[in-house]
Amino acid sequence: VSAIAALNSTLPRTQRFSSSDLVLSIDSLARSYPLLQVMNALFSNASVALNSVAGEKVDFALATMGVSPTVIIASSRTMSDYHDRIMQPHTGPISSLGRWVQSRTLEAGNMPSKNIFSQLARIGPTAELSLDKLRLICISHRIDGDASARLSSEQLTDLRVFTGARVVYALTGPGIAGAIAQTNVFDYRCLTGQSHFGSPLSSTEVTLTGMSESHVSDGIPEGQVR
């Protein structure tokens, strides 16, 4: 229960699930994060869509076919594969121009609005998708999962630009209800390398071990998550 409440409270009031949402999970409900996000949707009186195409690694276009959700719950592996196989190769000169303009808006701290540049950006990378109502993508990465599936800040920026949706990126782990940490939905920073996972959820207590006290200070918290 506390994990469901924590997932709900990490979203600002204007971005939380509501009765007007259609939530689609394309990640397996055998995993804690997608399951509790679906329960969060039900608690918020949102509609939930389920299909037979769900798992850690699925075809994003196939899994979203025939439905127009406002919220999608997916794994980092699914989104990483779709970005590398479809989005990046199909980003031509026109899409690149639209992406450049839209990414400048994100760097300024604002979510790009739907305009001519957003349409230009999506000409190639998301032409096969019908996600006009999509407003939020909830992505999770398992702490014991394949490191190659971790998303970079650049990939998260592409997902925001090409889908027109905000993105939250969560770190999950075995035995953890919901998530260990999750990014802020309004954090649009594009940093070098792999993206961070934000701050810990209110339902999680994180203990760092494996570092001697002489090497750890309040300014540099380091260690292994226990």
Ranges and model annotations:
Residues 109-226:
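Conserved AMP-binding/adenylate-forming
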Residues 26-29, 160-161:
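Short low-complexity stretches enriched in small and charged residues
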Residues 28-30, 147-148:
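Residues that cap or flank secondary-structure elements
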Residues 22-24, 225:
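Short, well-ordered beta-strand segments
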Residues 2-22, 29-105, 166:
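Conserved AMP-binding/adenylation subdomain of ANL enzymes
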Residues 25-26, 140:
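Short hydrophobic segments within beta-strands
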Residues 18, 27, 36, 201, ...:
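Eukaryote-biased feature marking scaffold/signaling PDZ-domain proteins and nuclear chromatin regulators
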